[in-house]
Every structure is written in C-alpha cells, then in structure tokens.
Amino acid sequence: LLSYYFPPEDQSRLMGLCAAMNQIGGVIATLIAGVLAKVGWNYAFLVYSMGLFVLVLVLLFLPNERLDAPKGSGGFIHNLKRFYPSVLGMLLLMICFFIFPTNFSAVCVKTTNLDPIAVTVIMVALDVVAALVGVVFGGMMRLFRLSVKYFAPIFFLLGYLCFATSPSLPSLLVGCLFIGIANGIGVPYLNTIASIKAGQDAATTVMPLLSAALYAGQFLSPLVATPIAAKFFPDNLSGIYWIACAFSVLFLLEAFATRRFQSLPPKE
C-alpha cells in the first residue's frame, strides 16, 4: 500500500520503518512466548492471539481500497521476468538470513560455554539491531544511493565469516551485529526498489512475488544449506557458516549482475 499512497521519495523511509516494526514485533512476540512457555509449553501458542489486536487495527485504520490489476500488467510469468532481480534477491537474502536462526543456537550450545539464555539474548539483540537499522534506512538510501545495493550481502558475508572463523564471544557478537545490519538493510531495500520500479501497480504486480520469495527463502534455507554443509563439512559444526558465506557471495554477485535494475532513479 505504501507504493499506492506515497511518492517514491518517501517510500524508502516508510519501508525502513515497516521493516523495523517487523523486527520489533518479532522481539515482543518472542519474549511473550517465552513467558507463556514457562506456564506450559502449549500456552506459548497463545501469542498468535495478538492477531486479534492486529485485526482491530486493520479494520480501524487501513483504507478500503480495491486494488485491481491494471490492464496490460501481464500475468505471473510476465511480472516474474520483469521483476526477477528483486525477486531473486529476496530469495537469496532469506536463504542467507535464515541460516542464522536455524543453526546459531544449536552450534553455540555445542561449541561454546554460553548459557542457552545468553544465546537467546544474543539472537534477540540481532533483531533489535535490524530494527534500529530499519529506522535510519531512509537516510542510508539517500546517503549511499549507488552502493547501498551491496550492503546486505557484504554484511552477511562479514557476519558469517566471524561465526566460521571463531566461536569466541566477541566474534559471535560482532557477527550478530553484521547480520542484523544486513537483514535491516536488505528487506526494505528490495521492497523499496521494486516498489519504485512498479509504481502504483506494485501492490498487484511485484509485491506478491516478493512476499512469495520471502517465504520461499525461509522454507528453502534449511533444506538447501544443511545438506550441502553435511556433505562438504561432515565433521565441522561451523561448516554451515561457510555455506552461508558461499550464499552471501552468490547474493553479492546477483546484486552486481542486476545493478542497473537495482539502482535508484537519478536525483532530480
């Protein structure tokens, strides 16, 4: 809806705020679920009742627009060909990021002396970092117009290199900082670029594709990364992080190869 109601110059800031709220919501939901789980494991699922509160907000504040697909917008294949740089970028971004939550806790427990609660705090801190980055994302887009497209894959690579090379606490903290920055930049950036490229038709053309790519990446990440790590690093628990580095490089190459599409319009 942001692409429908707001001009391109406002969208980067608003997309960043949306991403920040997404991260903060994850932190809040995780904390509430943790408290409920202490009462009983099945009570943790009550966190989904927050959806009722969200439903009230939707009914009260979201506009009652009917967004029909514009004539000549094409179907699924046409839109995929048109916006594949952003769609592929979102898929790779989610594959890179979800290697972290699906492996970090298990690897830390086996390779460090950290308490499970400390590991949880570190993981929550990553979401906080991503939220803070989302808040300032609009300014970053204006300041680094030409290079911001490379930030997410580079910070993913740096973060996973920290994990892969050392299990020490400082290395883990720095790695989480880098990955939080990468996630805080990557999602709003890809949404913003696609939204600007599609204009007011974004809600019915590229945004559904980005949403599908986002969830596909989350689903595919462990299915793809874990078997590869098991094959190439069968006796190395940190091997999964080297696979994450490889996917980060692939993400960086994709950003470079599609750099013309992923560029912001020139300043007026």
Question: What does each of the following model-derived ranges do?
Answer:
Residues 1-6, 185-199:
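Intracellular juxtamembrane helix-capping segments at the cytosolic ends
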Residues 1-22:
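Cytoplasmic helix-loop-helix junction between adjacent transmembrane helices
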Residues 62-87:
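Juxtamembrane intracellular "pre-TM" segments in multi-pass secondary transporters
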Residues 83-124:
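Extracytoplasmic gate region of multi-pass secondary transporters
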Residues 133-145, 229:
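Helix-to-loop junctions at the C-terminal end of transmembrane segments
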